[in-house]
Amino acid sequence: MKILFAVDGSDYTRRALDYLATHDWLRRDNAITVFAVALAVPHRAAAMAGPSLTHAYYHDDAEVALRPVRQAFAADGIQAEFAWEIGHPAEAVARKATRDGFELVVMGSHGHGALANVVLGSVATQVLARCKVPVLLIR
C-alpha cells in the first residue's frame, strides 16, 4: 500500500509516529512517504530576502517536521521517502495524495469536537473534506 504520512512537527505528529511504530500493518510491505508543508511567506518578504534565502527558510521549516520522523524511522529500520512542498497544509496534503496515487493518508489530529472544528477549523478536518483517499487520523 502507498501511504502518505503527513507531519507538522507537533505533539500530534509524535502520537501518529508512536501509533505507526506499534502497528505493523502500517509499516510492513508499504511504501511510505513522509510529507511536510512549509507555509508560504508573504511575496514582499520573499522578494526582499531573495530566492536562495527564501528556499533555505522553506527547507529549514520543513526539516523541523521531517527530522524527528527521519530519526525515528532510521532507528526502527523503516524505509521511507521524505518530501515537502510550500503552501496551505490541507490543500498540499490532499493534492499530493491524489496526484501521486496514495492509497491512505495518515496524520495526527488534536481531537477537538465537531463544534470546535466548525468554529476554528483544523487541518485534519480540511484534509478529510478535500481528500479522495481514506484518511487515518491519530488522536
Q: Language-model segments: what does each one mean?
A:
Residues 1-2, 139:
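Absolute protein N-terminus
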Residues 71-105:
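Structural beta-alpha unit
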Residues 2-52, 76:
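Small/aliphatic-rich secondary-structure junction motif
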Residues 95-139:
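Gly/Ser-rich helix-loop-strand patches that form or flank binding pockets
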Residues 33-35, 81-85, 136:
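General small-molecule cofactor/ligand-binding pocket signal
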Residues 21, 63, 67-74:
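Class I S-adenosyl-L-methionine
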Residues 52-64:
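A short acidic, glycine-rich active-site loop
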